[in-house]
């Protein structure tokens, strides 16, 4: 793990310890009393105020007899709440089921499909707390005598908590909601803080106020959003099943930082399974399964930065397994993204992300997809830059393995592209990308297609092919060990003192697919450069080799040669322009090496043959 991730994890741990300690000390409460319960009949609201903890039984016993709070099924501890319940000034509501000694195994929240006043209720903590454990909570339509499944035409019951600054503008008034071992469903509609389960900090106070809670071992389903946070700090979402929500499954939003999202099964939601959006930093998103969602499996959106996405399984999502949108400095590794539309996509200026050891295979379109998009980035020009894609598997995708557009200065290294149904990479309007030591095999179009307006580099690679699509595009083939390349256009390798290269463009490649093979053969001139063209390179039989070299200058050039693919411990003659120059015995790896000094102004021909 990098120092940066260790640092982020350490900071997160400290934050969790701090906030847990803070709330255990500051939210320790007194017993519930009648003085803390106020019934407002005109607004159909119950207010619980002060430093107290109240259960439904206590509210029923101590509050007004007119509060519409009833036990509809005493034997099964089923309650019905027909009023809005508001927690203020540090008050805490306890909703515990019988498995942990509580009084409510199911809570039904009034949610009638009608336009009349007070047709639905909410539970809200505005500087307070809600503790839900081992129970079930649903909306309830009294007329239908059943769960309220309608969310579009009429409003629907929901639960939310708020944190804010006090009227002095300085003192934080913070709330917390914990949900464990519970079944929460059929809550919320499309309205601010009304999505179903919501944690929110008032806008403008993120730097001094947080909202808190842990969500563990629950089933959360058929809400408008499964979970929504806004300004949350150090929350944990652990081992939940989140499914069949209208929009998102898990949606940490604005400035929700230092969250742990681990071990959740998020599926069949209407849009993205897990989306973290707008300045959500230092997240740990691990070991989740996100599948059959209407959008992306996991999405990092609008400056969701400095986060770790690891060991997630993402399949059968309508868009991409993972999407990075206008987000930066994240590490994505060891994720498995299959059977989606795309394995991964980056857009709107996403930069400086590390994507390594992932599997982006068997997707219905692209394994990897990069594009600027039409959205305005929060900074920069929107092009995809300075990302590293290393040691990923991109196999058997239905279309292009890597679709690259408006992407610059990215590194693709050590990736496996096998059995895809189109190009290895289709590159358009993208410059200064480096493709290094990737494996290309069995793709229907087993080559890099430099389609349009693209100038890039292939570096330190063994076997590959390239097609140039227009006159302003090129691909520079380079090798840091000065290797010579044999290629289907018989183009010379330009050997320099510190590297070798071939610049492939439309002029020398035409419309052909040009195949390249990096030979076990390097030439390193001390000065100047040499154009080296292999003519014969036998790797079996007589192991003979032949090449030409020329500099075009009249001064003497000394060049170090390493020739491989020879039989070990066998003597070989080096013949220059038909004259025996010297003999060498190949070492145990089948190589000979020598320095040769001469004037290479005109073409010189070299032969290596087994000594007679």
Which residues does each PLM region occupy?
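Predominantly extracellular beta-rich ligand-binding scaffolds that present long acidic/polar faces
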Residues: 376-377, 398, 404, 416-429, ...
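Catalytic cores of secreted or luminal carbohydrate-active enzymes
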Residues: 483-537
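Surface-exposed beta-strand/loop patches in extracellular or lumenal glycoproteins
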Residues: 551-568
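C-terminal beta-strand-rich structural cap/linker in extracellular carbohydrate-active enzymes
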Residues: 587-612
């Amino acid at each position: 793990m990098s120092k940066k991730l260790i640092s982020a994890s350490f900071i997160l741990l400290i934050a969790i310890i701090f906030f847990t300690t803070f709330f255990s000390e500051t939210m320790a409460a007194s017993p519930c009393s009648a003085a803390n319960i106020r019934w407002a009949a005109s607004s159909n609201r119950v207010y619980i105020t002060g430093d107290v903890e109240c259960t439904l039984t206590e509210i029923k016993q101590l509050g007004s007899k007119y509060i519409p709070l009833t036990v509809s099924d005493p034997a099964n501890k089923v309650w019905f709440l027909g009023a809005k319940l508001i927690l203020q000034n540090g008050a805490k509501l306890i909703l515990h089921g019988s498995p942990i000694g509580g009084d409510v195994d199911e809570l039904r929240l009034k949610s009638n499909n009608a336009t009349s006043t007070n047709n639905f209720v909410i539970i809200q903590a505005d500087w307070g707390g809600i503790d839900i454990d081992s129970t079930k909570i649903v909306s309830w339509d009294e007329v239908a005598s059943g769960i309220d499944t309608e969310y579009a035409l009429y409003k629907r019951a929901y639960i939310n908590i708020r944190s804010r600054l006090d009227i002095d503008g300085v003192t934080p008034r913070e709330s917390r909601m914990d949900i464990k071992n519970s079944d929460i469903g059929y809550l919320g509609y499309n309205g601010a803080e009304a999505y179903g389960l919501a944690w929110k900090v008032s806008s403008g106070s993120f730097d001094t106020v947080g909202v808190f809670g842990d969500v563990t071992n629950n089933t959360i389903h058929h809400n408008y959003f499964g979970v929504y946070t806004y300004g949350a700090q150090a929350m944990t979402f652990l081992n939940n099943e989140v499914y069949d929500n209208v929009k998102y499954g898990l949606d940490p939003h604005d400035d929700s930082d230092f969250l742990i999202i681990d071990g959740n099964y998020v599926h069949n939601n209407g849009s993205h399974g897990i989306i973290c959006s707008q300045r959500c930093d230092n997240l740990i998103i691990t070991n989740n399964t996100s599948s059959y969602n209407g959008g992306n499996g996991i999405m990092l959106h609008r400056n969701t930065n400095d986060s770790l996405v690891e060991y997630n399984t993402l399949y059968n999502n309508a868009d991409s397994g993972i999407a990075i949108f206008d987000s930066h400095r994240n590490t994505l590794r060891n994720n498995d993204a299959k059977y989606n539309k795309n394995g991964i996509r980056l857009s709107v200026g996403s930069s400086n992300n590390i994507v390594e050891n992932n599997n982006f295979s068997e997707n219905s379109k692209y394994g990897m997809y990069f594009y600027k998009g039409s959205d305005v980035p929060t900074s920069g020009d929107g092009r995809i830059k300075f990302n590293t894609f290393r040691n990923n598997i991109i196999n058997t995708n239905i279309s292009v393995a890597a679709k690259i557009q408006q992407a610059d200065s990215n590194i693709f290294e050590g990736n496996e592209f096998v059995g895809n149904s189109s190009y290895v990479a289709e590159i358009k309007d993208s410059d200064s990308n480096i493709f290094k030591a990737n494996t290309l095999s069995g793709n229907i179009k087993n080559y890099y297609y430099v389609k349009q307006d693209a100038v890039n580099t292939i570096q330190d690679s063994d076997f590959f092919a390239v097609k140039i699509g227009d006159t302003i595009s090129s691909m520079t083939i380079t090798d840091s060990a000065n290797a010579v390349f044999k290629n289907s256009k018989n183009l010379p390798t330009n050997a320099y003192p510190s590297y070798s290269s071939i610049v492939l463009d439309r002029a020398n490649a035409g419309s052909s697919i040009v195949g390249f093979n990096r030979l076990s053969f390097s030439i390193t001139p001390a000065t100047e450069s040499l154009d080296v063209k292999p003519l014969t390179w036998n790797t079996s039989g007589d192991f003979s080799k032949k090449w030409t070299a020329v500099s075009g200058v009249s001064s003497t050039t000394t060049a170090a040669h390493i020739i491989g693919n020879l039989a070990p411990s066998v003597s070989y003659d080096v013949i220059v322009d038909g004259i025996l120059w010297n003999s060498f015995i190949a070492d145990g790896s089948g190589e000979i090496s020598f320095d040769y000094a001469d004037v290479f102004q005109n073409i010189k021909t070299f032969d290596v043959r087994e000594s007679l």
